[in-house]
């Protein structure tokens, strides 16, 4: 037999229905002031993501914990050690490259806009440098340096292949820079106390953008794209105070940074894994930790005649621009990090450097202003700042050298060198005007 079912009726407790309770809640008067009791403090720790979980929240917590460690660093050396400690595969950026249109790629990597021409001249004393400095003595010094390498010095050994011009231009530049700085130190006292480096390495390591790891034990994870520049300028001048800014820090540039939607492998760039380095050419304890001017010498494999023979005349100026953007970004970026700034603690003042790119005969001049180091995907979301690079077309210093005479010497190149070397910090300009 089937079991009988028994139904039991439960009486409803005397209270409000859901509809009535909702209406009562809406129409109830608000209670404020002393009638409200303080909410009890939670006696349990906050719920946070696991540090070892494979989730976005866990990854974000690991990143925040690492950033807090960098912020809590007590010295610049410790901060740089934390920032460069972890070694992953990174793209190696070569300032002097034969890649086609490398300057636009380098602008994308460094968030730099390029403006043709040099920035507007800053406030100068009553007289122009061309009227103050004895240009005849400077011209004679430059011609002596040229004739020393091209005429007076008789080399018995033949230069190695692809180094014929470099073997002559390198000693010429080694003589030119000290000669001009020595003659102009009477007009710019900063040069007298400056440090002149020869073939000193400059390194910079930074993160820009994100990518999905294609293979390996970390396959499928979203990771930052890492870059490293290992540069070696032929000569560089370091000073104890910062050069004045060319434009304000938040200056709105009407030019957009080129955007590259494909990977840097297409440039081509290659990934390597080795020690990360951030270095301006000296240690952090050196008081001469600000850059003044860099001098770069292009190798023979990038000389103008070879590019013309390969029907790559449009790449001649590209090589100059790419070298300037990569080298000056690395130098000014390392200077900013020596002062304690990094991607999550962006610069509060611009950092300025000057650059001269030459192949021994043609000279091109560049000015670089670093306005931001916030280049990571998270820090760059609401960052309107852009780094700016100004530059000129390459100009010949002379036409030819015949016997014991320099034909067609270009005074415009010499004047621009003088303007670069006479640039000084604001404090020195103010003292000069007072005196």
Swiss-Prot record:
Lineage, top ranks: Eukaryota, Metazoa, Chordata, Craniata, Vertebrata
Source organism superkingdom: Eukaryota
GO CC terms of this entry: mitochondrial inner membrane; mitochondrial large ribosomal subunit
Family: Belongs to the mitochondrion-specific ribosomal protein mL65 family.
Any one GO MF annotation of this record: structural constituent of ribosome
Protein name: Large ribosomal subunit protein mL65
Quaternary structure (record): Component of the mitochondrial ribosome small subunit (28S) which comprises a 12S rRNA and about 30 distinct proteins.
Alphabetically ordered keywords of this record: Mitochondrion, Ribonucleoprotein, Ribosomal protein
Keyword Signal in annotation: no
Listed InterPro entries: Ribosomal_mL37/mL65 (IPR010793), Ribosomal_mL65 (IPR039982)
Gene Ontology biological-process entries: translation
Subcellular location: Mitochondrion
Pfam families: PDCD9
